[in-house]
């Protein structure tokens, strides 16, 4: 199975979550968490930190990631590892391809599939963090 990751990046004050706005399919026009493909021979944390830096410019020195959960999609022959962390300091975002933005956690319906990618999974992930913490 091909491995992928998505990374939940909370702002330093923990009031906002970092998203990219998809410019093409899958999920064109929707907000998605940053992340990408796990390369052969790469472990999950290496891949998560690499993708985070490639897509946002956020380096290891600015955040500590925890491995929160995994999704296995047998019908798509892939797995998605979910990582979460809170920034230690303010950062300048450097988008790789898709525009980046901070979305407030309070009052946002992350289950809204007309706005957010993932068929409601982002809402599930945010709820898991709110209920059980960041790991």
Predicted regions and their residues:
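Short, charged/polar surface micro-motifs in flexible loops or helix N-caps
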Residues: 12-16, 26-27, 39, 76, ...
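Conserved Nudix-box catalytic region and its N-terminal flanking loop in Nudix hydrolases
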Residues: 16-54
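Short histidine/acidic/glycine/proline-rich micro-motifs that form metal-
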Residues: 38-39, 71-72, 109
């Amino acid at each position: 199975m091909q491995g992928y990751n998505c990374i939940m990046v909370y702002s330093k004050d923990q009031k906002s979550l970092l998203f990219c706005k998809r410019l093409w399919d899958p999920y064109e026009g929707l907000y998605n968490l940053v992340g990408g493909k796990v390369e052969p021979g790469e472990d999950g944390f290496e891949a998560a930190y690499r993708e985070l830096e490639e897509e946002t410019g956020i380096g290891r020195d600015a955040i500590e990631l925890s491995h929160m959960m995994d999704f296995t999609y047998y019908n798509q022959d892939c797995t998605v590892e979910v990582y979460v962390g809170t920034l230690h300091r303010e950062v300048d975002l450097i988008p790789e391809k898709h525009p980046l933005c901070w979305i407030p956690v309070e009052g946002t319906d992350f289950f809204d599939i007309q706005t957010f990618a993932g068929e409601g999974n982002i809402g599930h992930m945010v709820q898991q963090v709110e209920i059980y913490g960041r790991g």
